[in-house]
Amino acid sequence: MGFSPASRNRLTDYDLGRFPGNTLLDHVAQAVCHAACLPRKELYEAWETARRVRRLFRGGRIVDLAAGHGLLAQLMLILDDTSPQAVAVDQVVPPSAATLHRALVDRWPRLAGRIEFLASPLDSVAIRPTDIIMSIHACGTLTDVVLDRAIAARARVAVLPCCHDVDRSDPGGLSGWMNDALAIDVMRARRLASAGYRIWTQVIPGEITPKNRLLIGAVDGGRVSS
């Protein structure tokens, strides 16, 4: 069987031979393997999301909501050092998040002291207009909470939605033309646009996850970099 990026198996030092190169992804993966706590799928989801967002947004504090291990927040700082700090927020922060963070700091000492992990509700962090709000697979209506918080602060935002809840999210009457999940994401994009945002709609590779639609937004006419 091939090496599937969609696998939920943890990456460990046994996988180091799969990342023998000198690319940034190789270096990140090597650190993740040393930590021996992160599902393979989470590495690829975070990497593909972060690099697409960094092509558009620089600067600002990173706020990673429903962050899990907080890899996305840390990748944003690894990819571009113009963000001074990052906050990774989740109701429950996995104990192994600290293990992963130490492995990344060992490789990139400049991360030390710049990542804050908060085990708290997603609305516990005050959002600033200069922030970049991000979330990978915030389940169901949590994606809508992330968008609402970004819109209220006029902050930049990027979400990779999953687990679409047809009963609680808005498909906008579009389900006769497209599947419910796509209809809900279309309405999310339109909500950003209606709030005065410029939007970018992208996808990450489908072999990582079928829930691969990436929605990115910044206030139209505002600064993309901050």
Each model region followed by its residue ranges:
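Class I S-adenosyl-L-methionine
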Residues: M1-S226
